[in-house]
């Protein structure tokens, strides 16, 4: 929430888009410069935290490397359910309005690395 309050995400892009799975953003500018912030403890079951939120359509979750406590600003939004992520990634919220926008982003043209061919830029993120 601190990053939202600081408008950290304004101007960043969704850099990984996989239809039928998820859209990922929060770490790069349009010209692929990485925007850094501190990492946090991964709040999910296999890391010792009881988090029962399932990775269903519209759920927000923290992106990370294979290192469990490497999550920072990158997040992903589930386009479709992915139960194999349950207990392994820190789900923390759910889109309640605007799932049509998630569908639109999930279906933009991408290159061979699942990166949109035209940048999908985040204008701002606000608390509900």
Language-model region placement:
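Cyclophilin-like peptidyl-prolyl cis-trans isomerases
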Residues: 1-128
């Amino acid at each position: 929430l601190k990053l939202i309050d600081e408008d950290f995400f304004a101007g960043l892009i969704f850099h990984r888009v996989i239809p039928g799975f998820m859209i990922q953003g929060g770490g790069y500018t349009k010209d692929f410069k990485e925007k850094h912030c501190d990492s946090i403890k991964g709040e999910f079951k296999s890391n010792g935290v009881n988090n029962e939120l399932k990775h269903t359509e519209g759920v927000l979750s923290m992106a990370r490397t294979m290192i469990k406590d490497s999550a920072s600003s990158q997040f992903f939004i589930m386009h479709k359910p992915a139960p194999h992520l349950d207990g392994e990634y820190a789900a923390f919220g759910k889109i309640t309005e605007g799932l049509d926008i998630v569908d639109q982003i999930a279906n933009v043209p991408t290159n061979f690395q699942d990166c949109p061919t035209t940048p999908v830029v985040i204008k701002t993120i606000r608390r509900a």
